[in-house]
């Protein structure tokens, strides 16, 4: 780790020289990139400086302890040593995260697709609960939230719900929500008090940036159908053909949008979802080909993988990929997801850091 830190500190000096050159302002894109790198490397330097200070204090305390005779001073020094070790351990975990090269996609916006799975009506209701949970989380993080498509259930909740979330760090924090979420609770209609188990699936699709050249959709590869929008129960809610169904012929990806009264707006939303799905399919293909990338993931990201269980009677939420169990499900459902998302990101960074060390050894 020491060697890699010193390499980054040297890189920080190089970046500082480049960013202080007035010519850099003639290239806004490079300036923006260097500014982000400078911020990350400066944070790394600050944390490393803290480590060095704490290690010096720790060594001084150990030296003093070896010579101390007074019981009270010994107890105080031992407490200080223990506290110092704990603080240094925390700082090294932060350093681990900072030493992993940032993913250029970390700040991409995402499209999240939630679908009711096993459990019928109860699964649809839980989709509604999770939609609210993610909405509250997005608000707490200062992100922009947008409903893109919704298929309501007859008794409430949603058979399917598609949302767009945009802001800083969206993809980095939400990417590990992909998979099967299982819920265990007593339905309101259950008279015997029996706990039912149902499940929903969540897909997290990074939304391609406008200048992403890898996701090009040719109009001639699209089949676009228009029809009248319908609500729950199948009744038509619009007298014009405002609903849009787009089929991408080369991949077979189909997207339908009917929430807006305007056909133009529905088509625009459908195209956003379509591009995200095409990009996701390509990324999934690449991940399957790269075993190193697979081993670095927190779980496989497969929609069929059970990643989390929400047990309402025990107020418990368990993330099975990292063995994290919390007894504050009530707060989690109110959008307090930071403990879970941060733990997943840290775990993923730790794996990436370990893999990087193995490759360099």
UniProtKB/Swiss-Prot annotation:
<dbReference type="Pfam" id="PF03462">
    <property type="entry name" value="PCRF"/>
</dbReference>
<comment type="similarity">
    <text>Belongs to the prokaryotic/mitochondrial release factor family.</text>
</comment>
<dbReference type="InterPro" id="IPR000352">
    <property type="entry name" value="Pep_chain_release_fac_I"/>
</dbReference>
<feature type="modified residue" description="N5-methylglutamine">
    <location>
        <position position="235"/>
    </location>
</feature>
<dbReference type="InterPro" id="IPR045853">
    <property type="entry name" value="Pep_chain_release_fac_I_sf"/>
</dbReference>
<dbReference type="InterPro" id="IPR050057">
    <property type="entry name" value="Prokaryotic/Mito_RF"/>
</dbReference>
<dbReference type="Pfam" id="PF00472">
    <property type="entry name" value="RF-1"/>
</dbReference>
<dbReference type="InterPro" id="IPR005139">
    <property type="entry name" value="PCRF"/>
</dbReference>
<keyword id="KW-0488">Methylation</keyword>
<comment type="function">
    <text>Peptide chain release factor 1 directs the termination of translation in response to the peptide chain termination codons UAG and UAA.</text>
</comment>
<dbReference type="GO" id="GO:0005737">
    <property type="term" value="C:cytoplasm"/>
</dbReference>
<dbReference type="GO" id="GO:0016149">
    <property type="term" value="F:translation release factor activity, codon specific"/>
</dbReference>
<dbReference type="InterPro" id="IPR004373">
    <property type="entry name" value="RF-1"/>
</dbReference>
<keyword id="KW-0963">Cytoplasm</keyword>
<protein>
    <recommendedName>
        <fullName>Peptide chain release factor 1</fullName>
    </recommendedName>
</protein>
<keyword id="KW-0648">Protein biosynthesis</keyword>
């Amino acid at each position: 780790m020491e060697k890699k830190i010193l390499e980054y500190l040297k890189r920080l000096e190089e970046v500082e020289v480049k960013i202080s050159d007035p010519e850099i302002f003639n290239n806004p894109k490079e300036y923006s990139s260097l500014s982000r790198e400078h911020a990350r490397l400066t944070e790394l330097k600050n944390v490393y400086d803290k480590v060095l200070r704490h290690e010096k204090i720790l060594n001084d305390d150990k030296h003093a302890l070896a010579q101390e005779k007074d019981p009270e001073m010994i107890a105080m020094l031992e407490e200080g040593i223990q506290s110092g070790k704990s603080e240094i351990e925390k700082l090294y975990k932060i350093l681990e995260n900072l030493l992993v090269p940032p993913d250029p996609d970390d700040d991409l916006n995402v499209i999240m697709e939630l679908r009711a799975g096993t459990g019928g009506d109860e699964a649809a209701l839980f989709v509604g609960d999770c939609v609210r949970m993610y909405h509250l989380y997005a608000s707490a993080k200062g992100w922009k939230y947008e409903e893109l498509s919704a298929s309501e259930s007859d008794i409430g909740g949603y058979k399917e719900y598609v949302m767009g979330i945009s802001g800083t760090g969206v993809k980095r924090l939400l990417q590990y929500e992909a998979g099967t979420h299982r819920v265990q609770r007593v339905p309101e209609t259950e008279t015997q008090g029996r706990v039912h188990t149902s499940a929903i699936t969540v897909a997290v699709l990074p939304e391609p940036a406008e200048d992403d050249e890898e996701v090009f959709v040719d109009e001639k590869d699209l089949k676009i159908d228009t029809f009248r929008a319908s609500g729950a129960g199948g009744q038509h809610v619009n007298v014009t053909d405002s609903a849009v169904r787009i089929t991408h012929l080369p991949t077979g990806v189909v997207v339908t949008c009917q929430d807006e009264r305007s056909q133009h707006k529905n088509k625009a939303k459908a195209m956003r979802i379509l591009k995200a799905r095409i990009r996701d399919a390509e990324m999934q293909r690449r991940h399957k080909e790269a075993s190193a990338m697979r081993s670095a993931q927190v779980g496989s990201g497969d929609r069929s993988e059970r990643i989390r269980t929400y047990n309402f009677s025990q107020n418990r939420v368990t993330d099975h990929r990292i063995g994290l169990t919390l007894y504050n499900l009530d707060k989690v459902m109110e959008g307090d997801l930071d403990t879970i998302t941060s733990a997943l990101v840290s775990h993923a960074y730790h794996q990436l850091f370990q893999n990087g060390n193995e490759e360099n050894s």
